[in-house]
A protein has these predicted regions:
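Extended catalytic cores of very large enzyme megasubunits
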Residues: 1-426
Length: 426
C-alpha cells in the first residue's frame, strides 16, 4: 500500500494517508465479534484508494468492503459494517463521533428549521438534560448493517436532495418519545418518555415509517395512516383526491372508502347523463396517490375499499391482476373487499348474492356499516323490488373470483365490517 497518498479531509485540507488510524477504527468496530478478519477488510479497501481521495470516501469504501464479506459462514461482518456505518453517520451529522448534548442539538436543529419549534416550547432545558441522561448511544452498536442503511435511507432527519444527515438513531428515538408525550402532565411525562425510549431503542416495539421520519420535524406527522371517506358527488370525489395528495406528501399511508360511488350506467341528474362507473375515479385516486412520494421517504401507497354487493364488483375484483389493458385495470393501489355475515351465510347455504349500485338502494350503504339487522331487512326488501336495477350471482362464484384474485395478486384484503364495529374501539 502506498503510504504517500494524500487524502482530502472533511474541512478541505489535505494530509498523508494514516493507515494506523484506519486500522484503529477497524479494530474498535471488530471488538467482540466472531469470525471477522480486519486484514481482509483492509486488503479489499486499500486497492480502491487513490491520491486525493476524500476521508468520507475512504470510510464508505471500508464500509462496503466489510458489507461485501457478509455471508452465512461469517454473519458478524454485518455488525462490523454497521458499526463502521454508524461511525461515518455520526461524523457526517455532528462532525465527530461523540453526539452533542441533546438540548444543544435540538436548539441548533430548531434554529435551522429541521426540528419542530414545539420541542423547545414544550420542554425546559432541565427536562432536556434529564432526557439526555436516559439516552444510551451505545445501543447504536446493536444494529445490523441492513438496519443502519434503513435508518439512513428512510428514518433519520436529513436533506433528501443533498443527502446531508442531521441526527443519529438514539436522538430519533428520544425525540419521537418527547413529541408523543408532550401534552402529558409534567410530573409524569418524563417517566413515560424514558419507558417508551427504552422499549423502542431495544426493539421491543416498532414504529411505523411516517412516525419515525415525520414526528419531531416541522411537518408534525403524528398519523401513520389516514382513512378518507369518499361520497358519490364530484365535490366529494375531488375533495378525496385533494386529501390524498396532501396526506401522501405528509408521509401518511392512505385508506380510501370508495364504495359509495355509483355503478356504471347509473343516471346522473335524472338521466341527463349516465355515470362512467367506479374505474375512472379509482384511476383518478391512483394518480393522486402516485403524484408525490411520502415526504421523499417512499412512494405513496393506498388501499381502496368497496362492498362485495356493489354492482361493479366483478370488474373491481380484477383491477389488480396482470391480464386486461390499462383501460380496465388500476394496478398501483391495493384493494379491500367489505363483507358481512349475510354474504357468508349466502355462501354457506349455496345461495345468490344480489349486486346493487349504492345510489339505487337508499339507506343500504349506511346500514351495511351501522346496523346489520337493518341491512339484512333492506337488502332482502330491495332484492324483491323489480323496479331496482340489480344482478344476481351465485355466492360461490363471487367468493371464488375474489379468492382467485387474492391468491394471484396477494394484495386484496378482506374487511369483515360487522366484526370491525363489534371488535374495535372505533
Amino acid at each position: 500500500m502506498n503510504q504517500s497518498l494524500l487524502v482530502t479531509k472533511r474541512d478541505g485540507s489535505t494530509e498523508r494517508i494514516n493507515l494506523d488510524k484506519i486500522h484503529r477504527v477497524l479494530d474498535w468496530a471488530a471488538e467482540g465479534l466472531n469470525n471477522v478478519s480486519i486484514s481482509q477488510v483492509e486488503l479489499r479497501s486499500h486497492i480502491q484508494f487513490y491520491d486525493g481521495i476524500k476521508t468520507a470516501d475512504i470510510h464508505e469504501t471500508i464500509i462496503k468492503a466489510a458489507a461485501d464479506l457478509i455471508s452465512r459462514e461469517a454473519p458478524d461482518y454485518q455488525y462490523l459494517a454497521a458499526r463502521l456505518a454508524i461511525f461515518h453517520l455520526r461524523k457526517k451529522a455532528y462532525g465527530q463521533f461523540e453526539p452533542p448534548a441533546l438540548f444543544d442539538h435540538v436548539s441548533k436543529m430548531v434554529k435551522n428549521g429541521k426540528y419542530d419549534t414545539h420541542l423547545l416550547e414544550d420542554y425546559t432545558e432541565e427536562e432536556f438534560k434529564q432526557m439526555d441522561s436516559f439516552i444510551e448511544h451505545d445501543r447504536d452498536m446493536t444494529f445490523s448493517y441492513a438496519a443502519v442503511k434503513q435508518l439512513e435511507g428512510k428514518y433519520l432527519v436529513q436533506n433528501r436532495v443533498t443527502g446531508e444527515i442531521y441526527e443519529s438513531a438514539q436522538f430519533l428515538y428520544i425525540l419521537v418519545a418527547a413529541c408523543l408525550f408532550s401534552n402529558y402532565p409534567r410530573e409524569t411525562r418524563l417517566d413515560y418518555i424514558k419507558r417508551f425510549y427504552d422499549a423502542v431503542s431495544t426493539f421491543k416495539i416498532s414504529l411505523p415509517t411516517p412516525i419515525m421520519s415525520g414526528v419531531r420535524t416541522p411537518t408534525r406527522q403524528f398519523s401513520s395512516c389516514v382513512l378518507i371517506e369518499c361520497g358519490d358527488s364530484l365535490d366529494s370525489i375531488n375533495a378525496t383526491s385533494s386529501a390524498i395528495v396532501k396526506y401522501v406528501s405528509q408521509r401518511a399511508g392512505i385508506g380510501i372508502n370508495a364504495g359509495r360511488i355509483r355503478a356504471l350506467g347509473s343516471p346522473i341528474r335524472g338521466g341527463e347523463a349516465f355515470h362512467t362507473g367506479c374505474i375512472p375515479f379509482y384511476k383518478h385516486f391512483q394518480t393522486a396517490v402516485k403524484s408525490c412520494s411520502q415526504g421523499g421517504v417512499r412512494g405513496g401507497a393506498a388501499t381502496l375499499f368497496y362492498p362485495m354487493w356493489h354492482l361493479e364488483v366483478e370488474s373491481l375484483l380484477v383491477l389488480k391482476n396482470n391480464r386486461g389493458t390499462d383501460a380496465n385495470r388500476v394496478r398501483h393501489m391495493d384493494y379491500g373487499v367489505q363483507i358481512n355475515k349475510l354474504m357468508y351465510t349466502r355462501l354457506l347455504k349455496g345461495g345468490d348474492i344480489t349486486l346493487f349500485s349504492p345510489s339505487d338502494v337508499p339507506g343500504l350503504y349506511d346500514a351495511f356499516f351501522a346496523d346489520q339487522d337493518e341491512f339484512e331487512r333492506l337488502y332482502t326488501q330491495y332484492e324483491q323490488d323489480d323496479s331496482i336495477r340489480k344482478q344476481r350471482i351465485k355466492a360461490v362464484e363471487l367468493f371464488s373470483l375474489m379468492m382467485q384474485e387474492r391468491a394471484s395478486t396477494g394484495r386484496i384484503y378482506i374487511q369483515n365490517v360487522d366484526h370491525c364495529n363489534t371488535h374495535s374501539p372505533f
